[in-house]
Amino acid sequence: MNVLNNILVANNQQPIPLYPAQNKNRTKTSIFYSNDVHGQVPKMQRLVSAAEHTELEAQKKGSDILKLSAGDTFIGSDEKRNAVGATFLDIADFDAAALGNHEFDITASICGNLLKDLDTKILGMNLNFPSNKCNLSQKVMRSTIVEGDSGEKYGLIGVQPSDLESRIKRKEILEGITSDDKEQTIKELQEEVNKLKKQGLNKIILLSHEGYHVEKEIAQKVDGIDVIIGGHSHDLIEGVEEGKNLVYSPSGEPVIITQAGRDGNYYGVLNLEFDEQGRVSYVQNNVRDTNFFSPNLLMTNIVDKMLGKSPVIGNLQSVDPIPKNNLIEENPWADLVSDAIRTRLDADIVMINSANFRGSVDKGTVTERDITSIFPFNNKLFKVRISEADFVSAIKTCAKKTMNSKNSKPGLMQVSGLEYTVTKSGDVTEIIFKDKQGNKQSIDVNNPSKDKFYTAVYDEFLIGGGDEMDMLKREDKDILERYPFDKDKVTIDYIKTLKQPFSVHKDGRIKIIQ
């Protein structure tokens, strides 16, 4: 543990004093925070260990400890996996959690059933429930008050994405629930803050799944919020930087914004001091790698009971780290998976949208569950006949949108059987087809053939035109095969055929140039 502490301390950010120390009656607070864990079971097991360590360190310093989640703990329609997510909130002893859009990958009623018995407070100020209330409404609160060991009280508010309805597969899943738009959310936030202040609260924290740019706007428009534990846009916000995640409310008081990336790869520890007026007078924001910690044994045993012990399929000797923003770079796991699909399903090319990849696998023993955790959406695969012009258009469209959007969406197309080069402004300058014998052929990116056809495999999200990829929609005559499985099954079968131990590395098939 001493070695671990030395590593963590060495990676700590410099603390920033915001107000001069005029008195000694300051409240020390440490916030353990996470966001967008996306059902990553292996990461949850490590995050429980991280949460326990953070609590012990806070107690040593005499700090209050809060554990807060900004949403998207769940993902996909697998109820058992999402039940593990609910158990994670419970075992890690989260004080409160916001709901994200992926909590609604399942119906509101199922979500309510999974959350109903938790001690964790579920916050959703800008959700509107129909008159025939679903059970989720009985769990969700607009705000709550928690008391630290010091006796100090904290007001907590939670908000969901204002565009929630556009983030779900089917409207029926919401069972009549709607979310307020951004302007109404900001208006109601001010009203909710005012209510808490009337109750004597002067330390107010927002748990938000609105995304960084909206969260920054909230910080600058709503008076009385001290900290925003953010999520949804998957930003990795390290340290404290004025103008970025240290901004000022309309009355000129500091507001701290946090986010810890995505998929449970990182978590944050926000160390604060509040003065007697409830202003943040000292701040230190440490974003840490979850892999510093071993899986928590209790959580691991519970997972095995809930999901069953997962079969071992291989031994991973070495692996390239996934990019901090895997939407704008080649992903080593995407290389392995797309190559697996191309080999096992005998296609010329494979295309996978970057957002499909949720997490990675650590070195050592690899189980089926490790691979399944990467693909939570259960999007079945299709083999299709596609023209050169259509897949070139898809690659170019993704690149242009991704490199010119604030949130890097929809993400570059991950591929097998192809190599391509894209500029930082989103222009695709070169595409090369690489056949199964390794022979390369350059494609005219400015005039691709409409009459030359390839066999391609991609999933039902893309075949339905997801991410506005209408050029990838196929008529029945061009669908060569429908597979009753997603990418995880193919990848698991492929890994079993590899010489062990195996490695996962990028090979430069996607190049980014100035």
PLM regions: where:
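Catalytic centers of hydrolytic enzymes
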Residues: 27-28, 34-40, 260-514
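Short intrinsically disordered, low-complexity coil segments enriched in acidic
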Residues: 1-2, 94
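Short amphipathic alpha-helical "recognition" segments used for binding
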Residues: 17-18, 387
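Acidic, metal/ion-coordinating pockets
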Residues: 8, 12, 18-292, 328-333, ...
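Intrinsically disordered, serine/threonine/proline-rich low-complexity segments
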Residues: 3-7
